[in-house]
C-alpha cells in the first residue's frame, strides 16, 4: 500500500509533541515584527509573539513562499508516497492557494485540502486525518470524511483588542475608538472559512453567555466530543469559560493552548479562539 504523508502549516494550535509523534511535516508561516522577520514556531513562540502585541508593536503575518512547498513536496514524494497537505482556511490566508499551486508544479502525488478553519478547527481535522491514515483509508475517501467532519466543527473568536482590527482595516478608527471606550468585545465566527463579526459583548461574562447559547444551538441533540480553547494570554478567562461550559454541557475533554499568531495578530491580547467538535 502506498505510504501517506501529512503536511500542514503552523496554525493548528496542536502541540509540537503531537505533531512530531505523528510525523506531521509543518511548513510554517512567517511573522514580521517592527520590520524584523521571524519563522512562526521556529524563531518565535506564540507566547513571545503576544508579548509584542501587548507592547503595541507593528506585527504582520505572511504565508510561506511557494518554494517552501515545492521543496517539501519533492522531498517527501520522491519515494512515491502520497502527500496530504491540509491548511488553514483560504478565507483567512493565501497559504492554501500557494500550496495548491505548488502541488501542480511537482511530480509528487499531492492532495491539498482547505480546512475552512484555523486553530483547533484545523487541529481536530488533522487529528482525524492521522487516525484515518493509520486505518489505511484511501486519500479520496479521507477527503470525503474530512468534509463531513467539518460539519461538526464550529469556531468562534472573541476579540481581545480592537487596535488589531483597526490596523487590519476590519473596522474604522472611529468605531474602534468608540468600541475601546465602551470596552466592547466583538465575537466572530467562520462562515465558509471567512471571519464574520456576529455579536458585540460588553463583558467577559456576557461573551461567555452568548457563546453558551450559540453552542447549545449548534450541538442540538448531540453531545460535545471536544472543546478547543486557544487564548492570547488570558487563562483566567478560559477558566471562567470552562466552569460555565462544564455545568451547561458536561464537557470532559478540553484542549487548551496559546493561540496561533495568525489569530492574535488580528484579534489582540486577551482574545480567545473557541472550537467545538460535536459527536
From Swiss-Prot:
Residues in DegV domain copies: 4-278
Highest rank taxon of the organism: Bacteria
Record-listed hexadecanoate binding positions: 61, 93
UniProt cross-references to SUPFAM superfamilies, sorted A to Z: DAK1/DegV-like (SSF82549)
Keywords per UniProt: Lipid-binding
InterPro entries hit by this protein: DegV, DegV_C, DegV_domain_contain
Gene Ontology molecular function: lipid binding
Disulfide-bonded cysteines: none
Role played: May bind long-chain fatty acids, such as palmitate, and may play a role in lipid transport or fatty acid metabolism.
The name this protein goes by in its record: DegV domain-containing protein MW1315
Gene source species: Staphylococcus aureus (strain MW2)
